[in-house]
């Protein structure tokens, strides 16, 4: 197992509070999709459907939200570690509320919705951390 990856993942609030065995079990059994994005690459667009949980492990992104009337935009810069819009993954309106664009070379790990659902069912610590992020 790559210790750099596991150390970065442990900094993410979703993965805090796990026993070493549970954490190793998660890393072993969960299909993580790793991506490195170049500056100005778009991660997700506002209005697109959310099919996966995106976690920024390294780098910096810009979040841009446009009003429904297209009269104004709000931009915010966010650095790693960060879990991107977890509230959009499940629920009535599972679309992204803002566009996320990489500002510098950034490392992401993506978890599909099915994997997140499995983690929520099997690991109480993950479930508590996920609910804390939503509140």
List the model feature ranges, each with a label.
Residues 1-38, 88-91:
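Cyclic nucleotide-binding regulatory module and flanking cytosolic helices
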Residues 26, 64, 86-87, 118-119, ...:
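Residues that scaffold the ATP/ADP-binding catalytic core of kinase and kinase-like folds
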Residues 39, 79-80, 112, 134:
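A secondary-structure boundary/capping signal
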Residues 41-104:
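Cyclic nucleotide-binding regulatory domains
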Residues 23, 95-99, 114-135:
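A small-molecule sensor/coupling module
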Residues 106-115:
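A short hydrophobic beta-strand segment most commonly corresponding to one strand
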């Amino acid at each position: 197992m790559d210790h750099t990856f596991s150390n970065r993942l442990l900094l993410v609030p979703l993965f805090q509070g796990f026993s070493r065995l549970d954490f190793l079990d998660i890393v072993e059994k969960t299909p993580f999709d790793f991506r490195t994005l170049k500056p100005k690459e778009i991660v997700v667009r506002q209005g697109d459907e959310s099919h996966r949980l995106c976690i920024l492990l390294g780098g910096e992104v810009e979040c841009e939200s446009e009003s429904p009337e297209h009269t104004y935009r709000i931009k915010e810069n966010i650095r790693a570690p960060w879990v991107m819009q977890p509230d959009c993954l499940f629920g009535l309106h599972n679309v992204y509320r803002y566009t996320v664009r990489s500002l510098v070379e950034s490392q992401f790990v993506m978890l599909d919705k099915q994997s997140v659902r499995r983690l929520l069912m099997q690991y109480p610590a993950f479930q508590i951390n996920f609910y804390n992020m939503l509140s």
